[in-house]
């Protein structure tokens, strides 16, 4: 069961996030919560870390997320947060 929270008028974005994780999902990673706020935009909480996507979700962000997850999986890295809100790239936080 995935909890979806926030002032969401259109379910297209949360459904795209769920679809992305269903296609990509390695066995040990699963969605727990999807939140939208006007301040931070979309936040995804998994069993391992938090992902901040920003206010808009597009194919470029999802491809960047997939590349980042592939890199982390290949290198056995587990950040506490992946932040894709910056146009210049991805920020990883390894602190708790």
Q: What residues fall within each predicted segment?
A:
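Charged, solvent-exposed interaction patches on well-folded alpha/beta domains
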Residues: 1-96
